[in-house]
Amino acid sequence: MSSMTPQEIVSELDRHIVGQNGAKRAVAIALRNRWRRQQVDASLRHEITPKNILMIGPTGVGKTEIARRLARLADAPFIKVEATKFTEVGYVGKDVDSIVRDLVEVAVKQTREADMKKVRVRAEDAAEDRILDVLIPPARGASVDTARTGDPAGDSTARQVFRKKLREGQLDDKEIEIDLADARPQFEIMSPAGMEEMTEQLRGMFSQMGQERRRARKLKIAEAMKLLVEEEAAKLVNEEEVKTRALANAEQNGIVFIDEIDKVASRQEAGGADVSRQGVQRDLLPLVEGTTVSTKYGMVKTDHILFIASGAFHLAKPSDLIPELQGRFPIRVELTSLSVQDFEAILTQTHASLVKQYQALLETEGVTLDFTPEGITRLAHIAFEVNERTENIGARRLSTVMERLLDEVSYDATRLSGQTVVVDAGYVNARLQSLSQDEDLSRYIL
């Protein structure tokens, strides 16, 4: 897992997300504590449990983006789920145990890819040999291994010449016919509610039935090389060891991000049974507190999995969650609404800002977009004003405003090829004046 310091994590998040330092610090400390726990003596390590985080803030301020970026930094099994997709056991929908099963799948995939990377050089050599065996068949009476080791001498020289050409990419477009493992057919089984685990076992059992089939395929050498490297690497990886390490990794380092947690909170004044909502909360309790979940790879304990929940809490309040679940999220972080300065920073300072994206898109047609500082400031003001007058959808408002602003240029891009379009305050006002002044903005709301 990642050994980045909290300062390094926050610095990396700053490249993509503006403001929200409290939330960034909280997730950075939580991520660093995962690493710290691994350095503690084994007798005490088991007693140190993660402190789960609840992020509270309006939509479009960076809650989900923090989760997305954290997934790339964590170098640990990470899964993001929507709380609204789950229902109480017995109702139609996914049960919460599937969160852990999906996390284990991520861990297995991650571990397998890491192991395949380690044996990649050996796999590439084996793949090269298989391609060379097709290009230069062994001499009659000689085995494949004999040809590969260079006896007789003539074959060895030819193989060396072709190997050099192969590595230099001179043969990439040449077509060859090669034997490859055929993908096993996937069996789709409709699962009743609460029986996902049994369905997974049945699917696994059916997929293992029968012998591995191979068939000859005609491919360009470049494509064949990729497929052969994957096949050879898979042979060199110990699947049982992968499963064992993946289970341990999911248990000790796993991170689960639960989005839209407020949507399963029941408002006190609201009537109705709300069985499904409260049921999801009750089902989440043992998962967050620590329980054992059965997966197709084995049993997984959730005691040391870190849970980060987030929600806008527009209609409900954090106190509307059942008390037991509130207690499972001791760290609470409030994210603030975005200001005009934040909008400016989003447009100019982030690593892949909307300005850079639109410039790159139109550059493909020979149109140069030049945003002046005054133009960006005016754009930020308009986005902020529209948010204040209508629904506040945070940074997502910038996408609406930018699309409206550049609608004309995007449409006429082929005609404007070779020209430079300067987006200054006047340009912005000319196209968005009605948007910033008209009180009836309903048709511009996302």
From Swiss-Prot:
ATP binds at V18, G60, V61, G62, K63, T64, E65, D259, E324, R396. Pfam families: AAA, AAA_2. Gene3D superfamilies: 1.10.8.60, DNA helicase RuvA subunit, C-terminal domain (1.10.8.10), P-loop containing nucleotide triphosphate hydrolases (3.40.50.300). It is found in: Cytoplasm. InterPro entries: AAA+_ATPase, ATP-dep_Clp_protease_ClpX, ATPase_AAA_core, Clp_ATPase_C, HslU, P-loop_NTPase. GO terms for cellular component: HslUV protease complex. One of its GO terms (molecular function) is ATP binding. It comes from the Bacteria. CDD domains: RecA-like_HslU (cd19498). SMART domains: AAA (SM00382), ClpB_D2-small (SM01086). GO terms for biological process: protein unfolding; proteolysis involved in protein catabolic process. Its main location: cytoplasm. Keywords: ATP-binding, Chaperone, Cytoplasm, Nucleotide-binding, Stress response. A double ring-shaped homohexamer of HslV is capped on each side by a ring-shaped HslU homohexamer. The assembly of the HslU/HslV complex is dependent on binding of ATP. ATPase subunit of a proteasome-like degradation complex; this subunit has chaperone activity. The binding of ATP and its subsequent hydrolysis by HslU are essential for unfolding of protein substrates subsequently hydrolyzed by HslV. HslU recognizes the N-terminal part of its protein substrates and unfolds these before they are guided to HslV for hydrolysis. HAMAP family: HslU. Belongs to the ClpX chaperone family. HslU subfamily. This is ATP-dependent protease ATPase subunit HslU. The lineage of its organism: Bacteria, Pseudomonadati, Pseudomonadota, Betaproteobacteria, Burkholderiales.
